[in-house]
Amino acid sequence: MTKNVLVSVAWPYANGPRHIGHVAGFGVPSDVFARFQRMSGNNVLMVSGTDEHGTPLLVQADKEGVTVQDLADKYNRQIVEDLTGLGLSYDLFTRTTTSNHYAVVQELFRGLYDNGYMIKETTLGAISPSTGRTLPDRYIEGTCPICGTDGARGDQCDNCGNQLDPADLINPVSKINGETPEFVETEHFLLDLPALAEALTEWLKGREDWRPNVLKFSLNLLDDIRPRAMSRDIDWGIPIPVEGWQDNNAKKLYVWFDAVVGYLSASIEWAYRSGDPEAWRTFWNDPETKSYYFMGKDNITFHSQIWPAELLGYAGKGSRGGEIGDLGVLNLPTEVVSSEFLTMSGSKFSSSKGVVIYVKDFLKEFGPDALRYFIAVAGPENNDTDFTWDEFVRRVNNELANGWGNLVNRTVSMAHKNFGEVPVPGALEESDKKILDLATAAFESVAANLDQSKFKAGISEIMHVVGEANAYIAEQEPWKLAKDDTKRERLATVLWTALQVVSDCNTMLTPYLPHTAQKVHETLGRDGIWAATPQIVEVTNESPRQPIGVGLPDPEHTYPVIMGDYKTQLAKWQRIDVVPGTTLEKPAPLIAKLDPELGETGPEWAPVQN
């Protein structure tokens, strides 16, 4: 039975190019999942975009001496190019500075406001004494007043998991310039989380199939739930759609209020650009639809508490009741799939400290699938993981090149050399049946892992089949069979068996290694697009909905989006029979081995730090 599956991917912040730590958390896992779901015959919508509001973007624009819109345009395009190069198969990757996004965000806010879940209060806001600019919560650090840990942020303490306000911190300082922030009274709208706590608790306690770290963290947040400010004193953001506020260019909606609405607004934009403006409702209003949210662990709060609270309040499901908004009852997340951090030499990736490997540099030298493979087998799925060049070289050479690449090349080479085509097999022996049965069984078990976002377990099982297939060839010694004319039928059977297992493994590796999978598809003498790739499309800021207020996006503005025609690809999650008589050409090397010295030195653009 076909399922509708929404894959919502965390929105990268557009204040710089992406490094591999970013895509290890939100990028590759979500794409493996989406590609697998499509291959399984499900109706998939995968959306994301660049997050372009908030103080950090203003700070970066000042550093680069450009307008904030120019900065957003610059990094939006860079990120689009990086993610397209990595092969992330978005149905739409857009941005938050669009008229459509502004309008959808304002609709969500109005629904919450009308239902009584947006309350107006006077709070203490942090500003920079030297610039007068508002300091975002995450740009203030100090000692946690609850557990005493240094380095707690103004929104939460990563050590104890409690939500904080900047004014709660002991000895708060600005991360931008180290100065002590000044706290002033200011009026803001707060999301009344306590009024939604009971509904949130009931929903979360039904999420028993979530990753344990995500569920535990999310439930702990309920112990200290409090109203949370959803507006800011800033001139760069979405106008607050309330009379007396919408034309005040000094107050805008909080960047995290608008960013999580992006999953919905991107779905609406996708439907509009696809020619069926109501198609988004399949993924948001149908309660049978499954929705999965992919991100790094630092974003759990916003996806397991803030976003669900917004959805519940919009539908009038909190203690204050309320009416269902114009967009209808919107689906809550089926699962929040959070990854841990990918570090480098034991430290978090940091552009300012030079602890960084940019995606664009990596793609230029090594291509996309080497990085996709490393993240799949050694990424931070359940624990923080350290990236080292030594491990990267080792895994590419020993597993990808010597394992998978060797299996493909020697199998197809021997079949080409001895038959010029896929040979006709004779009667299968027990050894042939055993390896074929192993590959057959892997389809079901790998699928079960991928359906539960257990990507490491999935690829480990596939690579086990690859290893057993290489052992099968070593045991059967087809190069010896080729020297004996009386063994020609046995040679044909062994090579046909090996070709079938290559085909099976290639199918199962497709979500992980789509670019390599297309090459193997062609190496096996097959035509057509096996694994579709995303495309960059230039669009204009057209919108089916119009926002209100001041500081709105230019309706004539053009920008790049990522889209793709994935429904026409041939890849299916099932055995594709290798057909005797199919012409085979001599294969080119599938995966280039890396110089072992690279593991000791790293490349010039990201050398090993001694």
Curated annotation (Swiss-Prot):
Monomer. One of its GO terms (cellular component) is cytosol. This is Methionine--tRNA ligase. GO terms for molecular function: ATP binding; metal ion binding; methionine-tRNA ligase activity. The gene is metG. Transmembrane segments: none annotated. CDD domains: Anticodon_Ia_Met, MetRS_core. Its cofactor is Zn(2+). Its main location: cytoplasm. GO terms for biological process: methionyl-tRNA aminoacylation. Zn(2+) binds at residues 144, 147, 157, 160. Binds 1 zinc ion per subunit. InterPro entries: Anticodon_Met, Met-tRNA_ligase_1, Met-tRNA_synth, Methionyl/Leucyl_tRNA_Synth, MetRS_core, MetRS_Zn, Rossmann-like_a/b/a_fold, tRNAsynth_Ia_anticodon-bd. Is required not only for elongation of protein synthesis but also for the initiation of all mRNA translation through initiator tRNA(fMet) aminoacylation. It catalyses: tRNA(Met) + L-methionine + ATP = L-methionyl-tRNA(Met) + AMP + diphosphate. A motif ('KMSKS' region) lies at residues 348-352. ATP binds at residue 351. The lineage of its organism: Bacteria, Bacillati, Actinomycetota, Actinomycetes, Mycobacteriales. A motif ('HIGH' region) lies at residues 12-22. Belongs to the class-I aminoacyl-tRNA synthetase family. MetG type 1 subfamily. Its EC number is 6.1.1.10. It comes from Corynebacterium glutamicum (strain ATCC 13032 / DSM 20300 / JCM 1318 / BCRC 11384 / CCUG 27702 / LMG 3730 / NBRC 12168 / NCIMB 10025 / NRRL B-2784 / 534). Gene3D superfamilies: HUPs, Isoleucyl-tRNA Synthetase, Domain 1, Methionyl-tRNA synthetase, Zn-domain.
